[in-house]
Amino acid sequence: MKKTVAVAVILSLVFCFTGLMSCKDNSAKKKQKEGELKQIKTIEKEIEKNVYPLPTSAQVIKMLTELEVGYQIGISNPAENIKKYYTLESRSINLGVYGADLSYATLYNIEQKVIDYMDAIRTIANDLNMSKIYNAPLYDSIKQNFDTRDKLVKILTNAFNETYQYMSENDQQTLALLVVGGAWVEGMYLTTNVSEAAYNVAGISKVLIEQKKSFDLYLDLTKPYMDDPMISDFVNNLEPIKKVYAGLTTSLTDQNIKDITAAINIIRNKII
């Protein structure tokens, strides 16, 4: 939705600029056009910077529900682990992790878990000045739409978008990327641990291939921030899955899925 709005804004600017140029002579038009196109690109980059860059964990978990995979008790990061996260880095990463766990509990209608993860997220969000996003009205919206997955995905995705946008607009881009990274890892962990033999789940291969695209994009997004120790440390932790994904094509064997699962388990154990 935000990307659609961004495109609409940019197009309206183009039309506006075109109208202004119609009354200028050719030389002035050319100079004005160059300046305006440069301004459009600047606006476009600013808009894109504030838009959640990957499919959200809610969208990923929805894929699992569509594969008719049952809810697995005990695979989410326990909400009580929040007491372990006292650094800015660990809190940001696990805000993303808990966002994925909230999506998992919500889309499988596990109400007590939804409450637990909302509480954990609210605690971290308060520390990061985002209490207005993960508030009582959000929980009420989730509760009122428990039986409508598409609406739940939209509600959660909006919350994640607002989180990313808030951080980006407040010069916390590195923290925003840690949140996105934590959510990606946990989404992958939930995906690969929905069964003792995930490779036997029909359709799981397609989900994991789609996540390779997200992973590659995520690495590209982190490149400008690799001088930040928090980003470089997190990206270094992703090395196991980077190595596995580097050798894959457009289809996965059972062994590929086992390798992905093992790599994600290693990474996840480091961040939670």
Tell me what each language-model feature is.
Residues 1-10:
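Bacterial N-terminal signal peptides that target proteins for export
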Residues 18-22:
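C-terminal motif of bacterial Sec signal peptides marking the signal peptidase cleavage site
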Residues 24-26:
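Bacterial signal peptide processing site
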Residues 32-139:
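N-terminal Sec/ER secretory leader and immediately downstream segment
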Residues 98, 117-120, 124, 155-162, ...:
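Amphipathic, well-ordered alpha-helical segments in soluble domains
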Residues 102-109, 128, 132, 167-170, ...:
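Secondary-structure edge/capping motif, primarily at the C-terminal ends of alpha-helices
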Residues 145-225:
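Extended amphipathic alpha-helical interaction segments
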Residues 220-272:
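A cross-kingdom marker for long, charged
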